[in-house]
Structure formats: C-alpha cells, structure tokens
C-alpha cells in the first residue's frame, strides 16, 4: 500500500499530524482516512469486477457471432464451449421459478404477526388503565 513511502516519511507524517491535530483528534482523523481509503478500494474493485464481467460478455458475444458466421459447424473447442455457456445461461434465465410445495401437515396454523402485535399493544394499554 505504501510502496513509494518509507518508514521515515510515515513517521514524519505521524508527527506532523500529532502536532497539527493534537492527540484527541488524530485517532479520529486516522480512522476517517482509513475509512475513505477502504471505500475507494471497494469502489475500484467493484468497477474492476464489472469491467471484467462486461469484457467476458463481450467476448462471448464475439464468439457467438463468429460461430454464427461459420454456420455452427466445424467449430473450434473454444467456440463450442462459449456456445455451451450461452445455452446454459439462456436456460437458467428461461427456467420458471421453482415453487415449493407447502403441505398443511408441516404448519398447524398460519403465522400472522400483525394480530399478535395488536394483542400485545391492547394488553399493555389495558394494564396501564386504572381499575375502578
């Protein structure tokens, strides 16, 4: 992380920070700076991941166009693998959602949190009223 900065430079920055900010504000400043650095690293990594994903999609698209121009016959193994990946991705997108079968034996009564909260509120309101 500190490739171009040596130990003496870091020590000088620390001493200057201590003199300028003081001992009370220096730890807070260091924490906020490290938070900013972490946020920038996360943003850079997410941008890098998105670019890699877009490049992969673009490569698959180019392979598909190349395979289409060859008539889907006598394809190289790389092109055939790309087509197989595209087919599996298309099947996963077109696959309907799996609906889980809920049997009545598994649950004895329907769960409804709203009436329970209302009953709790009514009970607490009734306990606060004076009797008489």
Swiss-Prot record:
One of its GO terms (molecular function) is protein transmembrane transporter activity. Its main location: membrane. Residues 86-132 are annotated as: Disordered. GO terms for biological process: protein transport by the Tat complex. Residues 117-132 have a biased composition (Polar residues). Residues 103-115 have a biased composition (Low complexity). The chain crosses the membrane at residues 2-22. It holds the Pfam family TatA_B_E. InterPro entries: TatA/B/E, TatB. The keyword Plastid does not apply. It is found in: Cell inner membrane. Keywords: Cell inner membrane, Cell membrane, Membrane, Protein transport, Translocation, Transmembrane, Transmembrane helix, Transport. It is a single-pass membrane protein. It comes from the Bacteria. One of its GO terms (cellular component) is TAT protein transport complex. Gene3D superfamilies: 1.20.5.3310. The Tat system comprises two distinct complexes: a TatABC complex, containing multiple copies of TatA, TatB and TatC subunits, and a separate TatA complex, containing only TatA subunits. Substrates initially bind to the TatABC complex, which probably triggers association of the separate TatA complex to form the active translocon. Belongs to the TatB family. PANTHER family: SEC-INDEPENDENT PROTEIN TRANSLOCASE PROTEIN TATA, CHLOROPLASTIC (PTHR33162:SF1). Part of the twin-arginine translocation (Tat) system that transports large folded proteins containing a characteristic twin-arginine motif in their signal peptide across membranes. Together with TatC, TatB is part of a receptor directly interacting with Tat signal peptides. TatB may form an oligomeric binding site that transiently accommodates folded Tat precursor proteins before their translocation. This is Sec-independent protein translocase protein TatB. It comes from Shewanella sediminis (strain HAW-EB3).
């Amino acid at each position: 992380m500190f490739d171009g900065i040596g130990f003496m430079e870091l020590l000088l920055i620390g001493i200057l920070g201590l003199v300028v900010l003081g001992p009370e504000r220096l730890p807070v400043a260091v924490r906020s700076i490290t938070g900013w650095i972490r946020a920038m690293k996360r943003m850079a990594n997410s941008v890098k991941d998105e670019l890699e994903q877009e490049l992969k999609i673009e490569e698959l698209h180019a392979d598909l166009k190349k395979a289409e121009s060859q008539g889907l016959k006598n394809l190289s193994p790389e092109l055939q693998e790309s087509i197989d990946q595209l087919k599996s991705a298309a099947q996963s997108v077109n696959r309907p959602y799996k609906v889980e079968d809920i049997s009545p034996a598994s649950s004895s009564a329907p769960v409804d949190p709203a009436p329970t909260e209302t009953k709790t509120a009514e009970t607490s309101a009734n306990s606060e009223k004076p009797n008489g």
